[in-house]
């Protein structure tokens, strides 16, 4: 079984069977908010530790929302490439905060409001990831995202050695 498939299955199993808090030190789940406007609404990142020597990092719905601005303040209105770059810049910052990098990503889900942007998405991905092997990715066309000005959003799962 390829390692990526094994890790993805292990990741899903961990989410389905893990409690919402640590029990007997076996599994530790921590939930994080990195933007002021998301506090009390949802967790932008969740880490799961205690499954072997792995720390799973799950990032939810990273887009071009200004993490330092008011709720719904989206940067680069109408500019797909710049929204993509901004989203992946946030992904890199949040992964780094949790001890991970793009090299540790094993799964990406990309949501875009217009599939005609897929070639521009490809360029953004090449520019962002450089020589890093890109993980599995599912591209999904959607009618809308969290805010009307958003045209791209990504979910990322990464796995690193627990410390």
Regions found by a protein language model. Name each.
Residues 1-5:
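Positively charged n-region of N-terminal signal peptides that target proteins for export
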Residues 6, 10-89, 93-107, 113-163:
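N-terminal presequence-like segments and the immediate start of the first folded domain
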């Amino acid at each position: 079984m390829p390692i990526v498939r094994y890790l993805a299955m292990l990741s899903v199993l961990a989410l389905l069977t893990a409690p919402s808090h640590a029990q007997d030190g076996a599994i530790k789940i921590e939930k994080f908010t990195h933007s002021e406007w998301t506090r009390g609404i949802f967790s932008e990142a969740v880490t799961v530790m205690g499954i072997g020597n792995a720390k799973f990092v799950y990032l939810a719905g990273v887009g071009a929302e200004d993490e330092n601005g008011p709720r719904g303040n989206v940067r680069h209105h109408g500019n797909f490439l710049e929204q993509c770059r901004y989203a992946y810049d946030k992904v890199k910052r949040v992964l780094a905060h949790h001890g991970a990098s793009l090299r540790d990503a094993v799964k990406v889900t990309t949501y875009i409001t217009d599939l005609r942007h897929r070639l521009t998405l490809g360029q953004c991905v090449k520019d962002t990831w450089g020589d890093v092997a890109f993980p599995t990715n599912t591209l999904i066309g959607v009618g809308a995202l969290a805010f009307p000005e958003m045209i791209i959003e990504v979910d990322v799962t990464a796995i690193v050695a627990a410390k």
